């Protein structure tokens, strides 16, 4: 069955009916926040406040993992100050730089007890190299799946969310195989391939290139100071100042990706594209889109 898609040109009665449907998906307490980088850390801090609230607000015990960064103490300290100012009950840094540290009973105990984990930006390959296939990652994965933990990742911390991960590449070019470097991510949301700093760095071409190589995955491009909040019921909702771009290959009919040279242009037929902004929703499994309630006239 083809997925249902909201056509914004629908008649008003249809839009009003969708308005009621929009109110149906209820946010569960915990969530996974995938942030496109450069989130507001000074003024309204909406995205960081949303993470703080989902992690327990004044009762939050937040653990910051700055393993992607070359300056983990500095970047971790910045987030500690932010969440302490918001009123978190406890905030700590787990400065994990080597895989052996993931065996530490103290580290594992912290992750079993905390209510929120924040993965900072930096280098996604460094982050995966430290955390993948470790007890630390297993604790995070199981607690997220069980609805016991709110997880956020920004920039590199967002890139690692899928099983197939964009490790690097170019920007602003015609889609081709050499435009994107792929690696294995942490698989927290295995159905997606995430790119970050998306429109800010002109990365549409490389996300399409990644999806052409893995047409069983959903491409998600997230702008700076923008967040895709993944709920446990399959819905994602957009927060922040930019947009979230969905590249959906569900109905893809043809790509030449397996047969062309690395620098030759790609052919990709029948991709579906959604551009979502504040309040819009998308269902990860049903491939359904719903507009923000505030955009529907009463």
UniProtKB/Swiss-Prot annotation:
Biological process, per Gene Ontology:
proteolysis
Q: What class of enzyme is it?
A: hydrolase
Q: Kinase as a keyword?
A: no
Q: Which InterPro entries match?
A: Class_I_gatase-like, Peptidase_S51, Peptidase_S51_cyanophycinase
Which terms in the Gene Ontology molecular function aspect does this entry carry?
Answer: peptidyl-dipeptidase activity; serine-type peptidase activity
Q: Which Pfam families match?
A: Peptidase_S51 (PF03575)
Q: Which UniProt keywords apply?
A: Hydrolase, Protease, Serine protease
Q: Which Gene3D superfamilies does this one have? A: 3.40.50.880
E.C. number: 3.4.15.6
Q: Which reaction does it catalyse?
A: [L-4-(L-arginin-2-N-yl)aspartate](n) + H2O = [L-4-(L-arginin-2-N-yl)aspartate](n-1) + L-4-(L-arginin-2-N-yl)aspartate
Q: Enumerate the active-site residues.
A: 155, 173, 197
Function field = Exopeptidase that catalyzes the hydrolytic cleavage of multi-L-arginyl-poly-L-aspartic acid (cyanophycin; a water-insoluble reserve polymer) into aspartate-arginine dipeptides.
Family annotation (PANTHER family): CYANOPHYCINASE
Its protein name is: Cyanophycinase
